Curated annotation (Swiss-Prot):
It comes from Trichophyton verrucosum (strain HKI 0517). GO terms for molecular function: methyltransferase activity. It catalyses: 4-(3-methylbut-2-enyl)-L-tryptophan + S-adenosyl-L-methionine = 4-(3-methylbut-2-enyl)-L-abrine + S-adenosyl-L-homocysteine + H(+). This is 4-dimethylallyltryptophan N-methyltransferase easF. Homodimer. 4-dimethylallyltryptophan N-methyltransferase; part of the gene cluster that mediates the biosynthesis of fungal ergot alkaloid. DmaW catalyzes the first step of ergot alkaloid biosynthesis by condensing dimethylallyl diphosphate (DMAP) and tryptophan to form 4-dimethylallyl-L-tryptophan. The second step is catalyzed by the methyltransferase easF that methylates 4-dimethylallyl-L-tryptophan in the presence of S-adenosyl-L-methionine, resulting in the formation of 4-dimethylallyl-L-abrine. Its EC number is 2.1.1.261.
Amino acid sequence: MGSINPPQILDIRRSKFEESIPKQVEAGLLSSPKTLPALLFYSTEGIQHWNRYSHASDFYPRHEEIQILKDKATDMAASIADGSVVVDLGSASLDKVIHLLEALEAAQKKVTYYALDLSFSELTSTLQAIPTDQFVHVQFSALHGTFDDGLQWLKETLVIRDQPHCLLLFGLTIGNFSRPNAAKFLHNIASHALVESPSQSSILLTLDSCKVPTKVIRAYTAEGVVPFALESLKYGNTLFQQDAGENVFDPEDWYFLSEWNYVLGRHEASLVPRSKDIKLGRPLDKIVVGKHEKVRFGCSYKYDSEERKELFGTAGLRDVKSWSKEGCDVAFYQLKCCPN
């Protein structure tokens, strides 16, 4: 039987990310086109809305990831070096990664799994849901912080720096970045986490190749997406109220818009004023969002084979293995540093 001691949550935040969000919101709303930052959508309540939305029957990315993990987890586990530090960059969906953790345990791989998340309460819930008493070889811990905090922690923590590292990027996370920024982010991961033990360290990520607009739009307008999107405005009000004492946003004034961009090969999610120009509340009261003006908050890029090849190559990485299933547009890729 495993340890009865509860897994530890390490606070690795170099600064409280919440403090930077208001400035990011203001900068995005002053830009052209207007945008909202991703961090605004991942409050504790936002993450809970996201989890409910991503379980909708039409949200194929999650269902396909689980199908593949159930079928291929044993092979994936075999590709992860014994003694690895496994860092899950976004741990909200335990129902996915648990299949890989169980396969690592069955293979008697002595690894330590670190769940990383922005929300302390979500980390606590995730760890409580893991049946740790059923694991002997796999150990559990958690990291409270951002992606960048996690990468810096990996690079600077002497006790684990020289161990093999496996970074998990499930949930099509890399698709949320523009194509150039996705390559930069992967290169950043490699430079922080793979270079100390390049032959044994890797990134395990998912990408989506679906460019069928009807399937994509149906997934990204599934039940639960509207509460998820509007929760960001409530969270923004909470952050700004500390200074202004009034609401910046009225969620009733906005609606959610889902579009497929044929040219860029991506899904685009925006919030749009319902019926009139909107003057925001203090301290953003100098900003007006025009009627029908899109405030984009998220994109999901889809990757065909040539785009994948360019992404990995630009990042200085090579895919050494991949896993998918017939009928699935989602696939898992294991990436390692290109040999010098």
